[in-house]
Amino acid sequence: MRVPLKLKFYNFISKFIQQGKTPNFSMDAPKRIRKGEELALDKLKKYLSNNNIEANELLIKQFPSGYSNLTYFLKSSTQEFVLRRPPFGVKSLQGGHDMFREYNVLKNLKSQFAKVPDVYLYCDDSEIIGAPFYLMERVEGYIIRPNLQQKDAPKKEIIQNVSKSLVSSLVELHNINIEQANLNDLGNINGYIKRQVEGWIKRYNHSKTDSLQNMDFIASWLIENQPLEVKGSIVHNDFKYDNLVLNKDDHSKITAILDWEMATIGDPFMDLGTSLGYWVDKNDLPELKLFQLSATTLDGNPTREGILELYEQKSGKSIINPVFYYVFGLFKIAVIACLLYTSPSPRD
C-alpha cells in the first residue's frame, strides 16, 4: 500500500519516538518492582486470603513492558497470577484505566474467544493497594518484541505461520457474536469512525509542541475522507506482535492475546488499520524503519498488502478504501508517540 500521505508522517514521528531496549525473542520475565510502584503486601495478602486465594509466602514482581496500566506477577507457594491496576497518580479511572471494564471484557469474551487469559477476581476497594485491580491467569510463552534482530529471530517458516495466525485471530475476534459474548454495552458502532477521528485529532492538539503542517493536513484529510460504517464488531485497538503470547513449545501458535484496555465495539476495518500502521515493510523508507514498533521486517513476514489480502480472504470481506484505515492507523500511532514525548512520565 504505497500512499504518498504516509511520507508526511516520517519526519514528524522521528522527532518523538524514544527508542529503548526491550527483550528479544524470549520469555516475558517479571523484574524487581520499580520505585514508587510498590504494592501494600500485607493488605493484599489478607484480601486474597479472605477471597479464598492462597497467599502464603506471596512474592510480587513487575512486568517491565507497557505504558498504560501496571502489570505485576504474583506467586504464592502453590499458584501464580497476574495483577493489573492503573498507574499511580492517574487522575481518571475511566477509559483505558477502568479495571472493571477490562476485567469484564476478558470475563465475557473467554466463552467465545479462547485466546484471552482467564480472570479470577476483581476488587474495587482502593484501600487495598491504592486503586481498583483484578487478577488474571499468568500465561507463559514467548513475545516477539519490536527490536528483535534477524539473527535472534525464529525460523522464516515460524514467522510465516505467526503472521497468518495474527490475521486469523483478528478475523476470529471480529466475527464474534457480540450478544452471545454479553458485551452489547461495551461500545456504540453508530458514529464510531467520526468519534475516533475527532478524538485522536483532539489528543494531538492537546499534546503537540510545534506547529506541524503535515499533521494538520492529515487531520483535515481524515475528516474529509471518512468511509461509510460497516457492521460493528469487538475490536482490540492495539493488535500487534508484542501483544501476542506464543506457545512456549510451538512458537508458531498463539496462546493468548494481551492488553485489552482499549477494546470496544467499533469498525473492524479501523482495528485492521491500526495493525497496518504498525506494520513496517522491508522496502519502506529508512526513517520509518528506525522507529519500527513491531518486528514486521523479519524474514517470513508478508507485506502490508499481504496482510490486507489475507484479512480479506479470511473474512470474506472486501475493503473498499484501505488507504483511509491505514492513514488513520499511522495518525493514531503518531499521536501516541507525541503523547509519550510530552508526558512528564511515560506512565502518567
Locate the predicted segments by residue.
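Juxta-kinase regulatory segment immediately upstream of eukaryotic protein kinase catalytic domains
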Residues: 20-53
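All-alpha amphipathic helical-bundle segments outside canonical DNA-binding/catalytic cores
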Residues: 188, 318-329
